[in-house]
């Protein structure tokens, strides 16, 4: 379902003021989490993991900023449609509102003067621009991030690797007949090129839920 434009957009000063309230002591660490939906509303395994991550982060006196696409998508955001992706921001479990990714990137750059340890963890890239996520990571003063393999979206827009949404395909080569016959085939070509560019531009530490998932992902 297509959502209308938000009535109000946060500015970088708004984000900075929320994370660093006047007169307060800055947290030692700010963890910025990239997710695909609102974990405070949607129930699921990924969302449960994010909830735990937020709890553990804030319990230690640190800050947790979660960014999800304002407009949910079944794929990556396309630059031609969304050159500056709109995201919904949640800070320590409290909704702040919506902002463009360029504003979030600017805020992250400003925050590093007060918070020395700003980290990015990617739970899901559905609806996001990987190019802007890379820019966000660089804005923290780091070239590294963590990325969870909750599924295989980094290998194909069909995150469960089901050809035409029916049968498991095993992430075959792009030139295969399987990709040529699949409704995700054309999108996968653009998708993989952008994923490769992300992994080239950022030092990504991959977190897998099992050895099987890690081995399968590395093999592809």
Question: Where do the PLM segments sit?
Answer:
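Catalytic cores of nucleotide-sugar-dependent glycosyltransferases that transfer UDP/GDP/TDP-activated
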Residues: 1-220
């Amino acid at each position: 379902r297509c959502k209308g434009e938000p009535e109000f957009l946060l500015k970088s000063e708004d984000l900075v003021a929320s994370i660093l309230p006047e007169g307060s002591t800055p947290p030692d660490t700010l963890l910025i989490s990239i997710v695909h939906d609102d974990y405070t509303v949607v129930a699921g395994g990924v969302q449960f993991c994010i909830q735990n991550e937020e709890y553990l982060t804030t319990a230690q006196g640190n800050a947790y900023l979660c960014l999800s696409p304002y407009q949910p998508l079944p794929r990556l955001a396309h630059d031609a449609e969304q050159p500056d992706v709109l995201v919904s921001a949640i800070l320590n479990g409290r909704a702040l509102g919506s902002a463009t990714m360029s504003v979030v990137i600017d805020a992250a750059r400003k925050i590093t003067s007060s918070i020395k340890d700003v980290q990015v963890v990617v739970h899901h890239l559905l609806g996001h621009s990987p190019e802007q996520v890379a820019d966000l990571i660089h804005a923290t003063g780091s070239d590294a991030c963590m990325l969870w393999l909750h599924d295989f979206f980094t290998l194909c827009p069909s995150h469960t690797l089901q050809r035409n949404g029916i049968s498991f395909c095993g992430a075959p080569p792009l030139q295969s007949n399987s990709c040529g016959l699949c409704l995700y085939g054309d999108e996968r070509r653009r998708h993989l090129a952008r994923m490769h560019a992300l992994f080239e531009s950022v030092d990504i530490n991959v977190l897998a839920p099992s050895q099987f998932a890690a081995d399968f992902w590395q093999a592809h």
